[in-house]
Amino acid sequence: MIHFSRSLTRLLGELKKLPGVGDKTALRLAFHLLKSPDNLTALAESLLEVKAGVRFCSVCFGITEDDPCHLCSTERDRTTICVVEEPQDILAMERSRAFKGRYHVLHGALSPLNGITPGDLKIAELMKRLESGAIREVLIATNFTVEGEATALYLTRLIKPLSIRVTRLAHGIPLGSDLEFIDAATVQRAVEGRSEL
């Protein structure tokens, strides 16, 4: 068995916490960084900068350096909210240039098998935003997975009694896929072909 220094062992352990990074990839990344001290320093500084300056928007819960974020503070359509699972889903929607409203990030999807309930998501915050009376449409853009569909159905049941139009991205995005990996043209068609729930 190979023994590494305490600091290298710690680095490997931290790298393996990243999604898709196992033992071999962590080792490859660590040695790459060690071969280039300038890159290692730049990465460390960048991580500290993100930790100090990036936070969640107090309105939509997207990622921002300013609060509220630029999407909440601009003159976008204030009558429509697009609900997404994760902050990176906003990027997919924005790449399509098809949606002109505001966003709301749930930070996950309902998954009783994994212990994720409505209280674990930003659903109460969404409902509070809807109480203002200014919102006329909620576009549900959760992923087309079992969890995403369950979340969409749950939200629809909560929102419909408020007499707010509830729409869903058109099916055209493959089932079982994550929104962040869909190309801009497909997202645009899905937004334009959204349907009433």
Curated annotation (Swiss-Prot):
SMART domains in UniProt: TOPRIM
Highest rank taxon of the organism: Bacteria
Protein name according to UniProt: Recombination protein RecR
Task of the protein: May play a role in DNA repair. It seems to be involved in an RecBC-independent recombinational process of DNA repair. It may act with RecF and RecO.
Entry similarity comment: Belongs to the RecR family.
Domain Toprim per the UniProt entry, residue ranges: 79-174
C4-type zinc-finger residues: 57-72
Gene: recR
Entry's Gene Ontology BP terms: DNA recombination; DNA repair
InterPro entries, sorted: DNA_Rcmb_RecR, Rcmb_RecR, Rcmb_RecR_Znf, TOPRIM_dom, TOPRIM_RecR
GO MF term list: DNA binding; zinc ion binding
Keywords noted in UniProt: DNA damage, DNA recombination, DNA repair, Metal-binding, Zinc, Zinc-finger
